[in-house]
Amino acid sequence: MARTVHCIKLGVDAEGLDFPPYPGELGKRIFEGVSKQAWADWLKHQTMLVNENRLNLADARARQYLARQMENHFFGGGADAAAGYVPPTA
């Protein structure tokens, strides 16, 4: 049976994650209060940040930047927008 959480990002009760997606206290907070849909939305945004900012994930500073952005996305004022990203027009 799926876990249900009150998603702090979407503001609704939704299916929770199956396991903490990140190590440490931040991962625990995300596991306890973020839905699968909100996590999927973050992964899309994270991909845009990596691509648009040309981040090298082998660089510890890039990983620290993404961790800060993840925390801001879920628990702060929001993550940075991907610089230079233009959404596709339908």
UniProtKB/Swiss-Prot annotation:
Gene3D superfamilies: Fe(II) trafficking protein YggX
Molecular function per GO: iron ion binding
Annotated InterPro entries: Fe_traffick_prot_YggX, Fe_traffick_prot_YggX_sf
UniProt keywords, alphabetically: Iron
GO terms under cellular component: cytosol
Pfam families for the chain: Iron_traffic
Signal peptide: none
UniProt cross-references to SUPFAM superfamilies, sorted A to Z: YggX-like
GO biological process assignments: cellular response to oxidative stress
NCBIfam families: PRK05408.1
Functional summary from the UniProt entry: Could be a mediator in iron transactions between iron acquisition and iron-requiring processes, such as synthesis and/or repair of Fe-S clusters in biosynthetic enzymes.
Similarity comment text for this entry: Belongs to the Fe(2+)-trafficking protein family.
Protein name: Probable Fe(2+)-trafficking protein
Species per Swiss-Prot/TrEMBL record: Delftia acidovorans (strain DSM 14801 / SPH-1)
